[in-house]
Amino acid sequence: MVGPTRSKLREGSSDRPQSSCTGQARRRWSAATMEPQQERSAPQERTKWSLLQHFLLGGRKLPSGARNYAARRIQSLNAQNYFQLEEVAKLLLLNRFQFLFTLLDHFREKVQALQMHRFSHRTLFGLAIFVGILHWLHLITLFENDHHFSHLSSLEREMTFRTEMGLYYSYFKTIIEAPSFLEGLWMIMNDRLTEYPLVINTVKRFHLYPEVVIAYWYRTIIGIMNLFGIETKTCWNVTRMEPLNEVQSCEGLGDPACFYIGVIFILNGLMMGLFFIYSTYLSGSQLGGLITVACYFFNHGEATRVMWTPPLRESFSYPFLVLQMYILTIILRTSTVHKKHYMALCFSNVAFMLPWQFAQFILFTQIASLFPMYVVGYIEPSKFQKIIYVNMSSVALCFILMFGNSMYLSSYYSSCLLVTWAIMQKKSKIQKLGGTELQFWLIQGCFWWCGTIILKFLTSKICGVSDHIRLSDLIAARILRYTDFDTLIYTCAPEFDFMEQATPLRYIKTLLLPLILVITYLIFKKIVRDIMCVLYTNTYVRKQLLDNAELIFHTLQLLAFTGLAILIMRLKLFLTPHMCIMASLICSQRLFGWLFCRIHFENVVFGILTMMSIQGCANLHNQWSIMGEFTNLPQEELIHWIKHSTRPDAVFAGAMPTMASIKLSTLRPIVNHPHYEDADLRARTKIVYSVYSRKSAVEVRNNLLKLHVNYYVLEEAWCVVRTKPGCSMLEIWDVEDPSNAANPPLCSILLKDSRPYFTTVFQNSMYRVLKIN
């Protein structure tokens, strides 16, 4: 149901610049003070027991297998026997009462421990809920301040979802507007609007399980509330600044965009609560959890972009990676692992991989961190084998749930799992090849890397996905400095550029980087000592190695995330939160117990937090000071013109971000879109983007007609925009098509006069719609 419509003046706003040791010591002291008491009381106990045995057995020892019992009768008692009997009676009575008192005292201690344990868990989860709500409020505040989302019309809200965000949201919109949920699901699994005239399964291609689940929740919740007559949204007439007309704006669960964004922010709020629990477990202290939460907030702009771009795949996927790494930490630390932990690991793997195509490469770096730990001996072979089997099961489940998507079988992740399993099966044979322990390690490492690369290449050829762009291909292009049209389209985008030089400086100002360097240094000292112990003394310190497994894993994973973030700036979303988690180890007794036995570690922690907060609070203030209001009048005019002046089956082509908005808001068929990983789509996009090349107009027109395009949306900015040297469309095309480098740009010609091969049918300050003749 919809509440009453009221008038509300949109407020003016400025534009956004861019639209514990003490307890252990006490236990040791208690044990040390009790031992002498036990030694002093031992002779007395032996005297009493000898007296009791002498009286009952007449000085004889008990026969083998006999039980102690008192004589049934005493025929005669002399004075000595009387006093002996009295002493025995006191002893028996005292022992019984001592046993009873000891039992009651032990029971009382158990109850107190249980109550303290329950209170500790209540406190832990209570704090986790608190920081989760805090993060949720932080996200919605930043999002509202930036977009003024509560005052936008439905069309304006859709336009805020630019590039691939609009593409994902369009499928959510399709399901909720369909007559039934199953009909909507069938529509997106047999979609003809996205890559016209092809019919594609968008759930398989675009990893749309989040949209399917949220759409199901939306239809269910709204259906129940409508059944009981509960109001689901309230609408206003919002007066916009001149020359914009008045629009209707709605808030509440009944508004699809508000519901969709709300679910994403709730999920990421829960993630912050999970961060607190995770880091508390890793560090062994709730203060460690506090350190992680504070570091995350103080470095929020470097840790996530969910507050600016909610519908991106990482917003749904990354919280489940945090859950997966928490469960894996429990498995690595615990000596006896229950089946439920492996089941939870499998679930979190699947939940992490299903929404995001890049997730498999992140899990590959995880196996690459675990394998050397297995080789050196930080992980028991049986435990590591179970972890590999769980990961294999996760790949199989994702392959099934994604309708046989061959990308899951041809990735580095699946290849390294098979190679790891093979090395474990043939370990005895491989051991014969190496003489020393170090040689054995190196041979296994070479087999692992070479086998993974070769198997990945073979499976890609067999599955026919060798031409698809993945995260690994972009990293390889970065390292090898290989450039072509496809890689430049990616790497010229700011989020796929190298890490900014200012990023490490920001980490230093909040003390995050210095803290991580100290912690990493201490862990590496442990690693070197352990390896030297194995290699040079030939003594395998199994207990110590197993105790340090989770610390080694997090350090190796930190190195992997650092490398990824340096090569691709977008992957800071893995590095910065992981640094925040590892910062909690400043409260670890195993790393800093030598320090905390000399000074109170609470003072150290709060001192660090105080110094962090100097720059951290300034960062938060900068985020909160971002005030803006979304508006894009040229695109709004374009969408209105398309809705009212073109047929519903008119096919459009143009820049990928604009095509996503046209598909979302007008439901017109498009031939290209921002999901650029597929090889066929990249070929289509290259044809579409040839308008910005130096090719002839007739050649471009003929290629567009082969794609059944009726209208081309030309953007003047794309003709001249240059984000950095070598990244304008003309420069990219000169690399791809050097034979036409001497010709004039086609875009400039079409802007002057589009005839005879095109006709300009719509024009404003940003867009021109060219009808293809």
UniProtKB/Swiss-Prot annotation:
Localisation per UniProt entry: Nucleus inner membrane
Main location group = nucleus
In UniProt terms, what function does this protein have?
Answer: Probable C-mannosyltransferase that mediates C-mannosylation of tryptophan residues on target proteins. Required during spermatogenesis for sperm head elongation and acrosome formation. Also plays a role in acrosome attachment to the nuclear envelope.
Which Enzyme Commission number(s) are listed?
A: 2.4.1.-
**What family does the entry list?**
Belongs to the dpy-19 family.
Q: How does it sit in the membrane?
A: Multi-pass membrane protein
Annotated organism of origin = Mus musculus
On tissue specificity, the annotation reads:
Predominantly expressed in testis. Present in testis but absent from epididymal sperm (at protein level).
Q: Which domain of life is it from?
A: Eukaryota
Q: What is this protein called?
A: Probable C-mannosyltransferase DPY19L2
How is the quaternary structure described? Interacts with FAM209.
**Spans through the membrane:** 123-143, 210-230, 257-277, 312-332, 359-379, 387-407, 438-458, 508-528, 549-569, 591-611
Q: Name one GO molecular function term.
A: glycosyltransferase activity
Q: Which residues lie toward the Perinuclear space compartment?
A: 144-209, 278-311, 380-386, 459-507, 570-590
Explain the consequences of disrupting this gene: Deficient male exhibit sterility associated with globozoospermia.
Q: Which residues lie on this side of the membrane: Nuclear?
A: 1-122, 231-256, 333-358, 408-437, 529-548, 612-773
Give the UniProt keywords, A-Z.
Developmental protein, Differentiation, Glycosyltransferase, Membrane, Nucleus, Spermatogenesis, Transferase, Transmembrane, Transmembrane helix
Which Gene Ontology BP terms does the record give? spermatid development
Any Pfam family from its record, for instance, is Dpy19
Q: Name one GO cellular component term.
A: nuclear inner membrane
Query: Which residues does the annotated region (Disordered) include?
Result: 1-45
